[in-house]
From Swiss-Prot:
Main location: cytoplasm
Protein name: Phosphoglycerate kinase
Presence of the UniProt keyword Flavoprotein in the record: no
Binding positions for substrate per the UniProt entry: D24, F25, N26, R40, H63, F64, G65, R66, R122, R155
Gene name as annotated: pgk
Pfam family, one: PGK
GO cellular component: cytosol
Top-level taxonomic group: Bacteria
InterPro entries, A to Z: Phosphoglycerate_kinase, Phosphoglycerate_kinase_CS, Phosphoglycerate_kinase_N, Phosphoglycerate_kinase_sf
């Protein structure tokens, strides 16, 4: 069922109203406490700016880190409020706590178009327990609820799910709407052929995604460390490469399922090996049936890159989740960088390219190609769960489209 979004609300719905907006401001900080990547803050700007223009009173709720229900001075949202003030060109008032007298006072003093950022919602232990009393207190600060935190939508927490019981309307923000349009759209009604590229180190973390994508895709391309579990399941020697021995039967079952469904499941034909796990390790490129003892695979080989490029050439929709190798080490980044370049080229030809969260986003950004993709997801776990076909509590709780 489609969800109501901010675009469905009129000026009358928003002007002068106190609007609680759940955002994802869980940004990386360096040792000095400065933000090193403000992508998530920028991603929320369209929703915040729209509410300011419509003269709403904007109350932002966010989490940062994992303080485990206690105040942690290193996890306060002060750097976020400062950066947001710069981006908006106006003062963002931060509260001492997300509920209580200080929050109530600062919200009460708001004028139309003002922005208040509530302190880290996870400083309160009841947030992650989705406690109804805490949700009620948080909701009492506002009249309207907007969820724009796709990255936290897979959590049934008080600020993502509980507050919707006390606030109406409860709608999706622009970022949430865009995420659902691309990710849900790619799963439910894609332009075909639809391909998924799944990487990363472990089969175990992508079981649900692989099973779901084999059901929905025309082609599934597998890279990253998980390929060695598939190779070992085929009886090949994999040297010191990462293998999940308890997932060998699963790997066989996934290959069997793809074959039965007529889905093209592609594994690399060659790999780049290292003699140890380090950026300056000795390396060699070999066919997958020629991996010597004492060596480990850290990237897909050049032949495999060409194999994958050929498979993707006619695709109209491509979802990518997980790198092809240890792209953090330049010597083992070619597979991942080549896929980034290929997807950028496909985008230019009209293919819908979706980067489904996590390390693949970092890889595309490192390659300087993020702007060339159709959609870069801001959610790691949320993207995975949506691709698995799971219901996201933070989305399910929003009002259905009328």
């Amino acid at each position: 069922m489609a969800k109501r979004s901010l675009s469905n609300l009129s000026v009358e719905d928003l002007c002068g109203k106190r609007v609680l907006v759940r955002v994802d401001f869980n940004v990386p900080l360096n040792e000095e406490g400065s933000i090193t990547d403000d992508t998530r803050i920028r991603a929320a700007l369209p929703t915040i700016q729209h509410l300011i223009e419509k003269e709403a009173r904007v109350i932002l709720s966010a989490h940062f880190g994992r303080p485990k229900g206690k105040v942690n001075e290193d996890m306060r949202l002060t750097p976020v409020s400062q950066r947001l003030s710069e981006l908006l060109g106006k003062t963002v008032v931060k509260t001492e706590s997300c509920i209580g007298p200080d929050a109530e006072k600062k919200v009460h003093e708001m004028s139309n178009g003002d922005v208040v950022l509530l302190e880290n919602v996870r400083f309160i232990g009841e947030e992650e327990k989705n406690d109804s009393e805490f949700a009620k207190k948080l909701a009492s600060l506002a009249e309207v609820y907007v969820n724009d935190a796709f990255g936290a939508a897979h959590r049934a927490h008080a600020s993502t799910e509980g507050v919707t019981n006390y606030l109406s309307p409860s709608v999706a923000g622009y970022l949430m709407e865009k995420e659902l349009k691309y990710l849900q759209g790619a799963i439910d009604s894609p332009q075909r052929p639809l391909a998924a590229i799944v990487g990363g180190s472990k089969v175990s973390s992508k079981i649900g995604v692989l099973e779901s994508l084999i059901d929905k895709c025309d082609k599934v391309l597998i890279g990253g460390g998980m390929i060695f579990t598939f190779y070992k399941a085929r009886g090949l020697s994999v040297g010191k490469s990462l293998v999940e021995d308890d997932k060998l039967d699963l790997a066989r079952a996934l290959e069997k399922k793809a074959k039965e469904k007529g889905v093209q499941l592609l594994l690399p034909s060659d790999v780049v090996l290292a003699d140890n796990f380090s950026p300056d390790a000795s390396s060699q490129m070999v066919q997958i049936d020629s991996i010597p003892e004492g060596w480990m695979g850290l990237d897909i080989g050049k032949e495999s890159v060409k194999l994958f490029q050929d498979a993707l050439a006619d695709c109209k929709t491509v979802i990518w989740n997980g790198p092809m190798g240890v792209f953090e080490f330049d010597k083992f980044a070619n597979g991942t960088n080549s896929i980034s370049t290929t997807l950028a080229e496909l985008s230019a030809k009209g293919c819908c390219t979706i980067i489904g969260g996590g390390d693949s986003v970092a890889a595309v950004e490192k390659a300087g190609l993020a702007s060339k993709m159709s959609h870069i997801s801001t959610g790691g776990g949320a993207s995975l769960e949506l691709l698995e076909g799971k219901v996201l509590p933070g989305v399910a709780a929003l009002d259905d489209e009328i």
